[in-house]
A protein has these predicted regions:
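Short, acidic/polar
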Residues: 1-2, 75-88, 161-169
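Aromatic-lined carbohydrate-recognition surfaces of secreted/lumenal glycan-active proteins
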Residues: 9-17, 42-82, 92-99, 146-153, ...
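Glycoside hydrolase catalytic-domain groove-lining segments
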Residues: 67, 78-158
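Substrate-binding cleft of secreted/luminal carbohydrate-active enzymes
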Residues: 158-236
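C-terminal beta-sandwich/jelly-roll accessory domains of carbohydrate-active enzymes
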Residues: 254-379
């Protein structure tokens, strides 16, 4: 087998997820005559020395990846300042943190008291967390300036809105984060049955998925747009337009690719699933319409009963309109199994009754034998 320290896919080493720290009263149980000052000194030195021994062990074992220490969530520094000073003074290469807008709004334990939080505006919260030193503002402090920063869990909380991911990504970049790992993605085979504080999948949560794509560009320091009022976000970069819902934004040139949900200046579509419009050979466009999606049980509740939480509809039919400039005459084909079946032809804007699936929007009528169109390739 392959040793983890030599595995090319392991970029960094974070040995402990969300570690706990000693507090004064707990320390006093073993040090009954100990003072607060004594505890602070011990916490600083014990944390620093423990981390230094850990880094030394990794290096002696030949592991060359950066060593990351997990600093948890907002506000953790308040009761652990001496330990955090020890982290800053240690030999670890990087620190990691997370942010869950809305988690503090729920009664404890949150998994027994979930609520729908999509309707709440968390942009002021993200700003406040960023500015307050005792929350996550310490990430900008002089003590941690030489430590690389990572987000060990990038996710919302009981929230299906399409605006918050890019705002979080902007904050992460402001404090110097170089890596942000998503938590947690529901595998498509089970996504229809998944409920809880973290529900995220390309098919079942289209607005959230599109917003995460926008956030990816924000994390690369590309300007994006987002607002609570629209519950949406968008970005136009290098010819690709992405939006998680209807939002006013300036698009300075004709998009080459479009990923979106709902209506925009270039697409009218009443379906609730994501769509992808991508260029392909001979000036054609490839259109993918994802299934319509609807929550039929509360997505924010921990539902592991085997009953569906989301309904996906592959048969729903909606008018689709593509309004890119200078489209001219176009022929539309739909994939049916191995076949491309003619749907309609249009002049100017492309309009047709569509249902989830794949389409080709061709500049020229496909010169394929009718038998091939009907029977498919290979028959």
């Amino acid at each position: 087998g392959q040793l983890l320290k030599k595995h090319p896919a392991i970029a960094v080493l974070e040995p402990v997820n969300e570690p706990g720290y000693w507090w004064f009263e707990k320390w006093q149980e073993k040090n009954p005559n100990g003072t607060r000052d004594g505890f602070e000194k011990w916490s600083y030195e014990n944390t620093r020395d423990y981390l230094n021994r850990m880094v030394k062990l990794f290096r002696e074992e030949g592991a060359m990846q950066p060593v990351v220490w997990n600093c948890g969530w907002e506000g953790l520094i308040e009761k652990n300042r001496a330990a955090f000073r020890g982290i800053a003074a240690s030999d670890v290469d990087a620190i990691s943190f997370c942010l869950y807008p809305g988690q503090r709004d729920l009664k404890k334990p949150f998994w027994e008291n979930p609520e729908e939080l999509s309707h709440k505006n968390y942009l002021p919260y993200v700003q406040a967390v960023s500015e307050a030193e005792e929350r996550l503002g310490w990430l900008r402090s002089e003590a941690f300036k030489d430590k690389a920063k990572l987000v060990y869990e990038f996710e919302t909380f009981c929230n299906q809105s399409g605006y918050i991911y890019p705002a979080m990504a902007a904050f992460y970049r402001e404090v110097g984060a170089q890596i942000a790992t998503q938590w947690t993605y529901g595998l498509t085979g089970y996504a229809e049955y998944l409920g809880g504080s973290h529900v995220f999948n390309l098919k079942t949560t289209p607005k959230k998925a599109a917003s995460f794509m926008v956030a990816k560009q924000q994390f690369k320091d590309v300007d994006t747009i987002y607002s609570f009022e629209s519950r949406s976000s968008g970005v136009f970069h290098e010819g690709t337009l992405i939006y998680s819902g209807e939002i006013e934004m300036t698009v300075p040139s004709r998009p080459q690719s479009i990923i979106g949900v709902g209506h925009s200046a270039f697409v009218n579509y009443g379906g609730t699933g994501l769509y992808f419009i991508e260029p392909c050979e001979n000036g054609a466009l490839h259109l993918t319409l994802m299934p319509d999606t609807q929550f039929i049980r509360p997505h924010w509740k921990e539902l592991h009963t085997g009953e569906p939480v989301v309904r996906l509809d592959d048969e729903a039919q909606h008018d689709f309109e593509l309004k890119l400039p200078a489209l001219g005459k176009r022929w539309i084909y739909r994939r049916e199994g191995p076949r491309w079946v003619p749907v309609t032809a249009s002049e100017g804007a492309v309009r047709f009754a569509a249902q989830p699936g794949e389409y080709l929007i061709e500049q020229e009528k496909l010169m394929i034998d009718r038998k091939l169109l009907e029977e498919g390739w290979g028959h």
